[in-house]
Amino acid sequence: MSNVSSRTLTLGSRAVGDWSKALHAYAQREKDLILSSVETEKPRDDQSIGVPVQVMIDGPYGGCSIDLGEYESALLLSGGSGVTFALGMLDDIVGRVVRLGRRGGERTKRIEFAWCIRSFGGYHQGRVGPRFHLLIKAAAGHIHWVAPMLMDIASVVAGCPSLDIHISIFVTCLCDPEAVPQIPNSVVTMERPSTHQLLNDMITPPVGDAVDGLRWVGSGGGLGVCASGPSELTREMANAVAKLSLTSAEEVGGVGLHTETFVL
């Protein structure tokens, strides 16, 4: 939604069962076909390779219980494949603010996008028809299939002076930080995130003129929090919000919370 030139639906799947592994194998075969065709004939920039596949979409099953547009600040925390939910929420609110010009009265001024992963890894991408992309994770972590979308969204926000975004990536294994793609206004930390610290950073004014990450927009505008990923992560964030004092919550302007649990 934030990228006006995109009219596709991206589906994320983690290869852990028979069906998802078969889907992963399909995406790999299509990738090999694309690479082989490039070797014999260089495709045009606007040329895409489509494969007709019959799909059936079931739902809807509901959405986020809070509207991020009602809050001046938003914190999106995800772990592992929970990033699929957080990324969709990010794309939605950025599109409503930037592309649609706050048509619905959106108040959002700043967004912290925090993602906890095990490793950087890689990805396989396939295309099934003109409006569907498949991004298949073969193992945990794998920042590279999310990075292009994050870079696109960050670039869109860069042209909007009324919206600020900061991206924090927490890696819990010993990896090479230089392997991370360059995403605007992002930082990579080799540690597990503290949900309490992330929350406090969003509601605590900076000391003096120091600004690390998001700019301060003042108190009273409210904070919308979405946490998606393993149950331990979502539970920690729910506990962090619950431990806020009534006074702190009132000074912030209210705190809204939505959690989505992603398990194998």
Residue ranges and their predicted role:
Residues 72-79:
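Beta1/beta-strand and adjacent pyrophosphate-binding region of the FAD-binding site
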Residues 81-85, 233:
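Hydrophobic/small residue at the entry helix of a nucleotide-binding pocket
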